Amino acid sequence: MKARAPPPPGKPAAQNVHSEQKLPHDATLGSQQSLVHLKEALHNSTLDITVVLPSGLEKQSVVSGSRAVMDLLVELCLQNHLNPSHHVLEIWSSETQQPLSFKPNTLIGSLNAHTVFLKEKVPEEKGKPGLTKAPEKSVRLVVNYLRTQKAVMRVSPEVPLQNILPVICAKCEVSPDHVVLLRDNIAGEELELSKSLNELGIKELYAWDNRREMLRKSSLGNDETDKEKKKFLGFFKVNKRSNSKAEHLGLSGADSDEDPSKSASGGDLNGCVTTPNSPSLHSRSLTLGPSLSLGNISGMSMKSDMKKRRAPPPPSPGLLGQDKVSEKASLSSQADLQKKKRRAPAPPPPQPPPPSPVVPNRKEDKEENRKSTVGMEENYETDTSSLTSSVNGVSNHSLQEAIIPDSGVDDIPVTFIGEVSDEPFDSGLFFSGSNNAAALNQGGIASQRSHLPPYQTEQSQPFIRTNRKEPDPSLPSQDYRKRNQPILANTSENENPVGIDPRVTSFVSKPSTDDPKAKDKDKMCGSGPSEKTQTGHRVNSLPVNPRVGEDENSNSALPPWSHHGQASGGSYGLKYGLTTYKIVPPKPEMRCYDRDVSLSTGAIKIDELGNLMSPHMNGSRTISKPSAVAETEAPPIGKVKEFWRRNSMEKYLNGPAECTVKKAPSTTITATSEKPQRDETKAGFTLTTPEQQPASQEYGAPPEEDRSRPHSAVSCPVKVPAPNPTDITFLKPQRRTSSQYVASAIAKKMGPPKVHADVVRPHKKTAEQGHEEAKLARPPPAWKDSAVPNLCSEAGQCEHGTNQGSVRLPSNPGGQLPADHPKVEVNSTYGKSATHNSPAAVHRNSYFLPGRSSQRDRVSVGQSCGFHEKQTISNQKMNSTSNPSQALDKAHPAPLLLTEARDSGRILVNGSAQTPGNCEPPHSQKESTLTSYIILQTEEKPSPLSADGQNSDDALPSSIFGPKKKFKPVVQRPLPKDISLHSALMEAIHTSGGRDKLRKTAEQASEGRPKKPSYVEAESERSALLAAIRGHSGTLSLRKVSSLASEELQSFRDAALMAPGVDKPQQEDRGLPPPPALPPPSTPASQVPSASIPVSRFSIGTLSNPVNARQALMDAIRSGTGAARLRKVPLLV
């Protein structure tokens, strides 16, 4: 240890130091005074000295003693005419006979001077600077030593290591005897000391001290043995301490009267110390003796604290009673503290209701339980007023119950009065939108589905308890309020029960799991999404009679959610995982019902387009109804019951994964479907043929509403809602496609659609024309892959018994690309057609305008990008056999056909080719909307109903996309071709060919093989001209080539004249019509002969003369773009 600092010095020591510091000052002052006195004494004295000159001559001189030695030198040099700068004085003493040392200002009298030598200065010769040596090459050497230290030194790389070793040892402070130089500390390769750094190729090495390592190893061994000994001893010490604790705890536990293993996390905390706010599953408790008071160990909350502190001594047996009392007091205080921090426990069960029934509310319980985890079950005690038994034993409160307290009635009559939004929705999406964290109960699903949409509940049933659950939180609150307002009804204070027609009442079974029939029905429902979407089988949904009297309207009460809102203070919430949304509904709107109106006022009406019309829409839709859709009396109840029963049976037979139910093909939908039927708004299935069902049912595609004209002869898919009383549109928003959003925006922008009554024609009016249905002669080979041989013949002709139309939907042929869509041919007597549902369920309607009375509408749908080789072409023979007068002349060019078609009312319609294949997934956009050319070809003879057809063009039907506008047909006309010789030659120069290609084409034409379209021949002419132009070499060869070209052109012209005659029988053999016109630059085959014939005729008179042909070729060479490629040849003329 360091020695302590000396005490601070005292005052006497400071005085001594001060006096010591003053002594030199006094001495200097005395020496200066003595020097002055000495100067004054020497000023008067003189000295006799002998001066020896440099030449050796001695002189005697008397000098004053007060002169300085330097002044004496100058004076003597002046006397002897010497240079004082080149001479020096050397003074000798008479006593010592040696030169005295002096300073230039030393007084000569103070020196005992006897002889003064005046000598010349010897000039000091400066050494010549030698040659500059080159600096020695050195490198920075890094020396690692003691494993963690480094030293950097600059050494010569060419010197052996044994010469550098002393420098390394001095730098690292190690002894050279025990140092070994290593290349690295990993391999331990020892370096040879006879080699230099350059030879070894290193700039870093490791100096290893053998002696220090040996000492370190020995010390490490000793430390390890010491640690082992200490550890061994410490082990016994720790065990001894822990054993003492264990003995102490055991003794304290033995002294207690209660079981120390009892511990509770919530209310009973006897003998248990838990961390606050910790759940019971993860509570870390330390079991102590119950005799220990919690007041003594209130500071201990973790095990780490127990390690630091020892347990207090056990109390005396006499104080056990007092300790227990204090323990209970501390337990109650701590329990109260934890109750504030933790979630509130389950509330007490509700009391039995008084004689006037009061609806028990569990919304607050649902709000609390919604925040809990999925797997936790909270069992509540229920009284006689609640029957919430669970089939699967999960989450009893997740049901929506409909319970009558203190009653043994099995059925609850509930009347549904109100309106339903006309927008379609998918019941399959309802399950995915309302997929909660809590599991569903199969036993109470039927009651939940039946009581989910009671629009207005009679006041005569105040016992009904409805716990609602809004399944889709994605619907915003504004939209919720907007859809809620027209549904909330007037409140009536009349509590007297009203007699209700049993046909209008839907019966709801009581959710009791003891009923074996209910269990069987639950098993029939299956599992998965069908448990929620198909549980409507327990509700016998009947069509509501439109003769519901004024009693129902007058006694209509508020919906159940308004009662819950008043009772629970607006405790609304959506269950979506663990996130809670609260949507407070607006106040109910007072709606007055007129008593003196017709009986059908309260029913829901369906317009001619299939739209649902509510009596309280206040004129929001002004759709003029045709006379053919006049309101008649309601359909018989028996037929409707059978209709729904068949639907329910088909739903179970089709499998549990189906989300929509299809109607059987034997069911006929006539104009009665447009009459007021209330329960059609609660149904959600689409009438299609059985071939179209698997695609939409297997994958759960959302059904879209296809609205067709009422008396259309073509069997179109008609949207009939599913028998599901829980389908509330504001609770289950439809998953709509982008095209439907655009269509709804367009419909709102365009205004309400109008429909003419002339569009709807009865069946007899067209049957009197005496025209038969166009029968197809032979089906195309693509039919073998399709499961739909004749869609309308099964769905339309078998049902209605008349040949009203036929639809062919062939599947994709093997050679067709996936992007190419098959042809859809619709033969209709009314000139109208509607496309069918695609698997993607995108709504498309195509209305074809009626042309003439005797027309046969042949609709050829093809993809616009696949007209070259993949297009589907109708058979000419079939067309000629079905209607001989409609056979077209093959020699007419396509522009004339298009002009004629435009004049006679034939138009191009944008359609969509959609085929619901069985193997196609529903969401594949393979059958997307395509811009297709649809050519409606009619007969040429006039008809008396042409005026009606033209008048009906003015009033077009509207669809979900809004009113359809009439567009003029767009006919793609080819650009006018310049037939001048110069342009033909320039075109020949631009489009290069070759002689080889030209000859091959000529051989094919001469052999009579199947000839390519005539635009290949025009290209051959250009190739011939270009070959003639490129083949020249000078004027002589040009003349020769031009004559050859003229002969070849003549032969090509002859072949071109024969081409139409050859092409016509080939087309007749193949049965192919001339292809439609396509936009340039690819010239159609039917238009090329009309453009190429004038050119050939013009070139016959012009190119027949070889001189004119040569001149034309020369002009083309000089003025064309090919002149730059030609090489210059000297003229031989």
From Swiss-Prot:
Residues 361-371, 512-524, 993-1010 have a biased composition (Basic and acidic residues). A motif (KKRRAP 1) lies at residues 307-312. Detected in brain (at protein level). It is a peripheral membrane protein. Residues 272-301, 382-393, 442-464, 665-674, 686-696 have a biased composition (Polar residues). Keywords: Actin-binding, Cell membrane, Cell projection, Cytoplasm, Cytoskeleton, Membrane, Phosphoprotein, Repeat. It is found in: Cell membrane; Cytoplasm, Cytoskeleton; Cell projection, Ruffle; Cytoplasm. Residues 981-1001, 1021-1041, 1109-1129 form the WH2 domain. SMART domains: WH2. One of its GO terms (biological process) is embryonic axis specification. Plays an important role in the reorganization of the actin cytoskeleton. Binds to and sequesters actin monomers (G actin). Nucleates actin polymerization by assembling three actin monomers in cross-filament orientation and thereby promotes growth of actin filaments at the barbed end. Can also mediate actin depolymerization at barbed ends and severing of actin filaments. Promotes formation of cell ruffles. Regulates dendrite branching in Purkinje cells. Regulates neuron morphogenesis and increases branching of axons and dendrites. This is Protein cordon-bleu. It comes from Rattus norvegicus (Rat). The gene is Cobl.
